[in-house]
């Protein structure tokens, strides 16, 4: 009795395996994949450009660059004065 049940199941499984993947599961063709690469690169470049522009605008509107520039200028002037007094 088990052989009679196992044989139809085996036939169905074998038929499914030999049929291959369904069309929706089939791997895309190489040519279509390679054809989409320039579009994907352009999209990536545009996204990167937008994010970079937003970051630069954010830094321009921030007061951190001005404070940093002032701190470096003040520190440089202090060091310069100390060197002047030390070697004079």
UniProtKB/Swiss-Prot annotation:
Disulfide bonds: none annotated. GO terms for cellular component: high-density lipoprotein particle; very-low-density lipoprotein particle. One of its GO terms (biological process) is lipoprotein metabolic process. Residues 1-26 form the signal peptide. Keywords: Lipid transport, Secreted, Signal, Transport, VLDL. GO terms for molecular function: fatty acid binding; phospholipase inhibitor activity. It is found in: Secreted. InterPro entries: ApoC-1_sf (IPR043081), ApoC-I (IPR006781). The keyword Transcription does not apply. Pfam families: ApoC-I. Gene3D superfamilies: Apolipoprotein C-I (4.10.260.30). Belongs to the apolipoprotein C1 family. Inhibitor of lipoprotein binding to the low density lipoprotein (LDL) receptor, LDL receptor-related protein, and very low density lipoprotein (VLDL) receptor. Associates with high density lipoproteins (HDL) and the triacylglycerol-rich lipoproteins in the plasma and makes up about 10% of the protein of the VLDL and 2% of that of HDL. Appears to interfere directly with fatty acid uptake and is also the major plasma inhibitor of cholesteryl ester transfer protein (CETP). Binds free fatty acids and reduces their intracellular esterification. PANTHER family: APOLIPOPROTEIN C-I. This is Apolipoprotein C-I.
